[in-house]
Amino acid sequence: LIDSLQPVRIFGGNDRREEFQYAVSYAEKYTPQVVGAYLDDGTGSYVNGVYLRKWRAIVDLTADRLLKRVFYGPWYDKQRLLGGTRWVKECYLNFPDLAPEELKSRKDIFPLEREVFRADSLRRLLESLVDAYRTPSDEDFSVAQLYQEYDVFVVLPHSKAVARYFGGEKSYNEAIGKYLKGKGKVAVKYHPRESRFYFDCDASVTVFPASLPAEILFSFVQSKCVVGDSSALLSAAWLMPESRTICLCPRGLDENPILSLVKRVPPVEIVYS
């Protein structure tokens, strides 16, 4: 593909991926000035290398980096910060003002245009992706449901996070239930890796395909209120500025780096459960 296109700019959503790095390094054969461009990929664009367990950070940034460089070759680069590899020159971010100083000092930072994600041409492309993400369990879902207006759109965390931070499914359902009382149309989306339907809701609630990226839904769905966990709400606050955005947060996580980031995004309301 690169042999035929000979691109002058290559975009990627995660510059730590081997495919992106190899594509840029290979393209230099045709265009020495080829530009690697990073597209906002969520919290990793703003939080400098978050690891839930310290041993993962040690393995990821030492042994894993060394082994992959030996296996792939000297072109492979791994950095803690997304957008930070040597193959990236430009970074296109939802919130350029929140970019880490390390990124601002080394890369050219540009704002992403929200209107692009609302364009009809892109929506047609996204509609085709919806069908690609559909699984047998989503047989009752239709693309038309993306264009309906909802009172509340709930983006659910993984059940393991619910058990760890919210005291279990019952407590979490009670916390979410406060925002659903008296509401007409409600939609929910489970975490992509969720295997259990733990959310307590009736048949009137629209359940979006779990495998569908939340960012695609935020490009379509109109909802008066979006409730969910911190990471997904960054995209919601950017793509749905007209909606009330609520981050339901368990107490005791004030020092969480991702939550600290969300607090810097003005439209997002932090509500402790």
What is each residue range found by the language model?
Residues 19-21, 46-47, 161-164, 194-200, ...:
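Short, charged/polar "capping" segments at the starts of alpha-helices
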Residues 45-51, 164-165, 213-221, 254-264:
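Short, charged, surface-exposed secondary-structure boundary motifs
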Residues 47-49, 53-153:
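A nucleotide-sugar donor-handling region in carbohydrate enzymes
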Residues 156, 173, 177-210, 265:
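Catalytic donor nucleotide-activated moiety binding site of glycosyltransferases and closely related
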Residues 233-273:
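Catalytic binding pocket for nucleotide-activated donors in carbohydrate/polymer assembly enzymes
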